[in-house]
Regions:
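Extracytosolic ligand-binding ectodomains
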Residues: 1-289
Length: 289
């Protein structure tokens, strides 16, 4: 769809596609006619294929865009590799830094939600470690604490920023009830929320609460279903494939559309000088910068 739109804009694009499964020898695929003429290759899906494909692209000055969740660090040593996927540790560090930057004047309140799996423990532990290093005081409370004990964790003189240790919807909704009770019993407390990317899935029914508590959600994408450009693309998708977009976040089809538009436009505009930096951006993404 992205290539079709670019063609209507006057660009000439030739597309080749290869179905390369996990057991395929990528070296054999690279010997096929036409591969060496590519300006950009999107893939691979499997980590073991990254190194030979990256080496091939480097030797022929072909851009390699890896949008999938692979392991490896070719992006650090190969200037022709663009690795879109970021591992959990990198995203956690980015979220911690975003918190420290935006809430330096706030009082952090960590709420234990009694989630036995607790997949967000890595984030809360990393954030608390940085707060300790910086000498920032914070309080810890529990979602099941009595109202008076819960309230003691909150500052009456500073804005409070609440961090839950889970991204699950039931616990989030229970936290909203707890915060509303706090507001009733102790009016005047300023409360904000720092959440998780998963919370974007709850926006359709939690939007009012998100606004009420000035919620910040760290994310590498944003799907705006109300945007005219997004609605136009979704209509076109239904026309092409006779079904709506998969209900997932991010919308994978829009991710692919954004990637194709960004890299193809960039290469056509800047040629071998294209590095993908912000000064070369000539496309406004719909969802994924």
């Amino acid at each position: 769809m992205a290539c079709n739109q670019l063609k209507t804009a006057g660009y000439t694009i030739h597309v080749q596609a290869w179905n390369v499964d996990a057991n395929t020898d990528i070296e054999q695929v690279l010997q096929r006619e036409g591969v060496e003429k590519c300006n950009v290759i999107f893939g691979p899906l499997y980590s073991k294929q990254v190194k030979p494909l990256a080496d091939y692209c480097k030797s022929r000055r072909i851009r390699l865009v890896i949008p999938f969740s692979i392991t490896g660090n070719e992006v650090a040593s190969n200037p022709y590799v663009f690795q879109v996927y970021q591992d959990g540790a990198r995203l956690t560090n980015a979220a911690v830094n975003a918190f420290l930057e935006r809430f330096s004047k706030c009082h952090p309140v960590f709420v234990d939600c009694n989630d036995s799996i607790n997949p967000k423990g890595a984030f809360t532990a990393a954030l608390r470690k940085q707060l300790d290093i910086k000498g920032v005081s914070y309080n810890i409370t529990n979602l099941k604490s009595p109202d008076d004990a819960f309230a003691k964790a909150f500052s009456a003189t500073q804005p409070n920023v609440v961090v839950l240790n889970t991204a699950r919807s039931p616990e989030l909704n229970a936290a909203f009830v707890k915060l509303e009770r706090l507001e009733q019993l102790y009016p005047g407390r300023v409360v904000r929320l720092f959440g998780y990317t998963e919370w974007l899935m709850y926006a359709s029914y939690d939007f009012a609460h998100f606004c009420k508590y000035d919620t910040y959600i760290p994310t590498t994408f944003y799907y705006n279903g109300s945007a005219t450009a997004t609605q136009t693309l979704e209509k076109s998708y239904r026309s092409w494939f006779h079904e709506p977009l998969m209900q997932a976040l991010p919308r994978f089809a829009i991710t692919g559309y954004d990637h194709a538009q960004f890299f193809i436009r960039g290469i056509l505009q800047h040629g071998n000088q294209f590095t993908g930096n912000r000064w070369q951006r000539i496309y406004q993404s719909l969802q994924t910068p």
